[in-house]
Amino acid sequence: MAPDPEFFCATQTHGECLNRLEISLRLNRGLHVVIGDIGTGKTTLSRLLLERFLMYGSNYEFFLVLDPTWENSIDFLQFLKKLFRIESNTNSQVDLMNQIEHFLLDSTFNNNKRIVLIIDEGQKIRSDQIEIIRTLLNFETNNVKLIQVVIFAQPEFKELLQLHENFKDRIAFGFTVQPLGEKNTIEFIDHRLKVAGLDEDKKVFTEKAKALVYKHTKGYPRKIVVFCHHLIIDYIINGEEIINSEIVLTRMQ
């Protein structure tokens, strides 16, 4: 299921994460790590972060990595070279690092750009690539970091962090995205229905039905969206007046 920032509901945990992450980036803190289980909304948060900076027409330039599966450090550096649109034919790690550093210096001081690398699915990163990222974070002047990195990852990323204390110590902002509670789940459902254009006077779910949705999905946003999609299809096809607890229980079976 593709993330859709338009339907974002600023629940307490997601809203706090997004706001704190934005502040940390604007303060040029360096390394940021957001951890959460599958379906907790990490990818949506990454897209919202991009939208928020673009909205203000800022001098930040974001580079997005969706699938960090590289065989080795050279492959990772070659990927970054292409991502940063650096023209070069070298396969030397030292040369690639020097070229990337030159790009970051040029972007910062000649083009007045703050470079941010966003990595989704960060749990796929290998140990040797963690060291590359740590080296990139060393590129700084007395008062300016030449690159900031935001990693969105599943909980197993913590195991990799334990193996790299020097990298872990660099984390300026860390946040764990939790599933929604029952109250936020109900707000999440109501918000998405409103954004979809539902008349405020129209009720699609009973309160008991929404409580059962929470019980079934355990507050994971992706599961809530998929489950409610099935419920609404049932509601339309069967010509129901409202989605009640009986309809939800039937779908849960």
Region roles according to the model:
Residues 102-105, 109-152, 156-162:
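Conserved Walker B catalytic segment
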Residues 1-29, 249:
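A short, basic N-terminal segment
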Residues 50-53, 157-172:
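Short regulatory helix/loop adjacent to the ATP-binding pocket of P-loop NTPases
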Residues 71-90:
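Conserved NTP-binding/hydrolysis module of P-loop NTPases
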Residues 66-67, 160-161, 172-186:
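Conserved AAA+ ATPase "SRH/arginine-finger" region at the nucleotide-binding site
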